[in-house]
Structure formats: C-alpha cells, structure tokens
C-alpha cells in the first residue's frame, strides 16, 4: 500500500521544482480544459494511484462500422432498468421513479453499439414517501406531487426489446410488472445473480464498486444515472470467459435455470448442503439451490445421490425450471420430479 504524507518533501530537484510551479499554475483552470485528461493519463500510469473518471452520459450514436470492424453486427435490443420506490414490498409500496436506457447490442462481438432512447420520470404514489426511503434516494413528496409516468411511452420502449436487465432484478421486476404488465412478457436478466463476479476476481457486486473497477464514479441512487452506470459496467470484459458482462447476460438468457429442492434430505446432511450453497426454506422445510444450466443440473443430481441420499430407496428431488421469461419474478416455474434411483453415475 502506498502511504502519502501531507508534509512537503524536504528537497526538490530543479526539474521537480519547475514541475511544482507548473502544477500550481493549474489552479483556477476550468473543468473542461484539455489538460485534465492528460494529467489523469500520466497519474494513472503510476502504480501507486488509480484515477476515477466521472460518468458522463451520452446519447451520441456510434456507427456499426466503428463498433463491429470485421463483420456486420447481429443487432439485438435491450433495456437497462432501475427503479426508486417507497419501500421494499412490491405489494404495498409503489414505484416513484423509473429509469430506462434502451440500447443496441452486437451479439457477434459482445459490444454495445448505440444508445437509442432514455426514459426517466417520477410518479406520485398517492401517499407520503417514508423518511427512511427519502434518505436513500432523496426523492421528496414535493418532487412527485401530481406527477404520473407516461404509460404509453413505457410500453412503446418495450415493443422490440429482446432483454431487460436490472441490477437486482428480483427487486425491480415485481414492482414494474405490477405497474406495467407488459414487462411480464419480456425476458429478464440480473446483473447481480446471473454473473459470477467473485469467480472473476471481483469481491463485491455492488454497482458503485463495479463502477470503480471500471474506472468511473457517479452520484448513486437515482434511477437514470444508475442505469448509465450499469451500462458502463456491462461493457467490462470478464477474465473467466473473455466475454463482456453484457454478452454473458444475453447468452444466459437463452438457457433455462433450475431450482433443485432436496426433498426429505437427511438431517445429518444439512451442513454439507449449506456448504454447497443450498438455502433452507422454513416455510416448506426444504433445502434448495439454483443452478444455471442443464449440464450443472445433471452434475448437481449426481452430487446429491452420492453425498446426500446415498442408496436410499425412493429418493427424489423436485426441479423447478425457469426460462428468462419467469426468472427473477414472483411466479413459479415449471415443476417436475426426478427419481434419483434412475440416475446412472
């Protein structure tokens, strides 16, 4: 770790003194001066410093030829989405801000080509916003008074969208589906749960932290700027696959996910189930785990037979299948049962 002292150095070389004078001359320079990016570039080259750039949203289109140099783009359209709400319960609380950025994406390169539309509006929930939520997003009753979002524009933006992406989609999706049922007919992905950030050497999936990894900072907890930050984060190339994060989400949306319920698992296996990332559901008194592909599902069933059920007769598990249309929603997937005695190792 580099320790920076507030005390000035005891002596400077002639070149250092000249540089110090030049730096002092920078005081009062306007923020848009071309000198600042140059200084940031030089400081970034020093191993003891990491320079963060303020996120600047832009709607400037980029041509396909710039982005996809060797082949014609295979264009898909997506939306990154964020909400601010009056609370955590989608049944009793309301959306008071919706932010969406609609973009075009080249599935052959994993690159975002173009931002084509932006939506950010407020809505009066019809009751006072709780102080504890105002403290998070700073949206007050006065800001939303008498306002209603443009439903027609929301639905219009969704018309030709292949995928909706949210950072913690299991929170945002139930809220927006309650308010705009058209969201129910779209495929969804979650940039927290559908990307293994730890496998890629990133210790936190918090959006502000991921943005810093990408070299940017921003004022968080308002819907539109959170969307811009997420779009930048999704351009990140993941070390484990050498794919962009957004490419990983689009590809995972083409595959089913499976929730495995370890029905009647012996009590003495609870610790190894927990170590394997199974979660206990007290309402149904069962351990369960989500796996992301049919290959992983088969591996999981083999593991359960070997380490949990052994040679027990009649051992079976319940499997709930989710496509991207049901994923991260408050709806059940397609349920079936698998008799583990039929499973060949």
What are these regions (language model features)?
Residues 160-179, 197-264:
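Acidic, Mg2+-coordinating catalytic module of metal-dependent nucleases/exonucleases
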Residues 3-186, 200-217, 311-314, 322:
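Conserved non-catalytic scaffold segment of RNase H-like nuclease domains
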Residues 147-152, 222-229, 283-292:
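Short linear loop/turn motifs
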Residues 2-69, 236-345:
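Acidic two-metal-ion nuclease catalytic site recognized across multiple nuclease folds
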Residues 185-195:
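Short, acidic/small-residue loops that bind anionic groups at enzyme active sites
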């Amino acid at each position: 770790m580099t320790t920076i002292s507030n005390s000035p150095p005891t002596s400077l070389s002639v070149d250092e003194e000249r540089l110090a004078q030049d730096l002092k001359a920078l005081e009062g320079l306007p923020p848009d001066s071309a000198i600042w990016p140059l200084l940031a570039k030089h400081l970034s080259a020093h191993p003891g410093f990491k320079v963060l750039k303020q996120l600047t949203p832009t709607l400037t289109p980029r041509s396909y030829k710039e982005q996809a140099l060797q082949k014609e783009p295979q264009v898909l359209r997506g939306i990154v989405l964020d909400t601010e709400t009056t609370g955590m319960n989608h049944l009793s609380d309301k959306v008071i801000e919706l932010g969406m950025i609609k973009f075009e994406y080249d599935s052959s390169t994993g690159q975002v080509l173009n931002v084509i539309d932006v939506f950010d509006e407020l809505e009066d929930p019809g009751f006072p916003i709780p102080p504890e939520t105002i403290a998070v997003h700073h949206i007050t009753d006065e800001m939303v008074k008498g306002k209603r979002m443009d439903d027609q524009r929301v639905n219009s933006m969704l018309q030709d969208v292949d995928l909706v992406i949210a950072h913690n989609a299991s929170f945002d999706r139930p809220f927006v589906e309650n308010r705009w049922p058209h969201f129910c007919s779209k495929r969804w992905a979650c940039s927290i749960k559908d990307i293994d950030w730890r496998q890629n050497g990133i210790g936190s999936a918090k959006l502000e932290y991921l943005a810093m990894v990408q070299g940017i900072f921003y004022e968080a907890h308002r819907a539109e700027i959170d969307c811009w930050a997420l779009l930048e984060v999704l351009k990140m190339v993941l070390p484990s696959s050498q794919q962009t994060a957004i490419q990983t989400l689009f590809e995972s949306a083409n595959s089913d996910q499976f929730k495995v319920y370890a029905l009647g698992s012996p009590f003495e296996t609870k610790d190894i189930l927990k170590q394997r990332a199974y979660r206990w559901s007290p309402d149904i008194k069962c351990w369960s785990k989500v796996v992301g592909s049919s290959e992983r599902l088969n591996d999981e069933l083999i593991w359960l037979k070997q380490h949990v059920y052994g040679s027990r007769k009649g051992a079976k598990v319940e499997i709930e299948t989710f496509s991207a249309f049901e994923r991260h929603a408050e709806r059940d997937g397609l349920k079936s049962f698998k008799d583990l005695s039929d499973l060949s190792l």
